[in-house]
């Protein structure tokens, strides 16, 4: 079996990460004189990383964030001096999600509540949890549409079973 046939077989097995990394990893194995087991381990790591990346991307898309650029790295804590930085980073650990606790941001418009909500949602996704982000009016519209369409129970099941529901 040659490289092209092996790549095709790997894709059939749904191992696209291994297929994509096969040629460069073969060169690396020859150059670094990798043992067969080390070579295989590297290919498997490529596949695992690709799957993890795709899962993360899928969960971010499914979350429905309004602005994907809102992360804790992009939040300006100097803008709002009253923001408890330590508490925000504690929330970013996601412990409140695993402990089934609620969180609530209160404050006037323009103080960073939406940014922080999305940033914390992103951090929680990176820890392996599912997140659903909806603006309040969108959530109510979707619920009304589900009611009219006779799918209210399904919609409520979808919304209430996600580990973190963010209503902005």
Name the predicted role of every residue range.
Residues 9, 61-84:
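Dynamic helix-loop-helix/coil hinge segments at AAA+ ATPase domain boundaries and subdomain interfaces
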Residues 100-116:
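Walker A/P-loop nucleotide-binding motif
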Residues 81-89, 131-160:
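Short glycine-rich substrate-engagement loop in P-loop NTPases that contacts/grips substrate
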Residues 7, 15-68:
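Interdomain "pre-motor" coupling segment immediately N-terminal to P-loop NTPase/helicase cores
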Residues 121-133:
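Post-Walker A helix-loop "phosphate-sensing" segment adjacent to the P-loop in P-loop NTPases
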């Amino acid at each position: 079996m040659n490289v092209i046939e092996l790549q095709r077989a790997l894709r059939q097995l749904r191992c696209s990460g291994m297929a994509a990394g096969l040629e460069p990893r073969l060169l690396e194995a020859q150059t670094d004189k990798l043992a067969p087991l080390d070579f295989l381990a590297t290919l498997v790591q490529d596949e695992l990383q690709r799957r993890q990346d795709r899962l993360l991307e899928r969960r971010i898309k499914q979350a429905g964030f309004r602005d994907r650029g809102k992360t804790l790295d992009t939040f300006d804590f100097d803008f709002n001096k009253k923001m408890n930085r330590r508490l925000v980073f504690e929330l970013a650990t996601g412990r409140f999600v695993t402990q089934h606790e609620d969180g609530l941001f209160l404050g006037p418009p323009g103080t960073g509540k939406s940014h922080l909500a999305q940033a914390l949602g992103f951090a929680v996704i990176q820890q392996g949890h599912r997140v659903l982000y909806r603006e309040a009016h969108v959530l109510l519209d979707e619920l009304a549409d589900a009611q009219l369409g006779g799918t209210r129970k399904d919609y409520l099941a979808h919304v209430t079973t996600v580990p973190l529901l963010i209503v902005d």
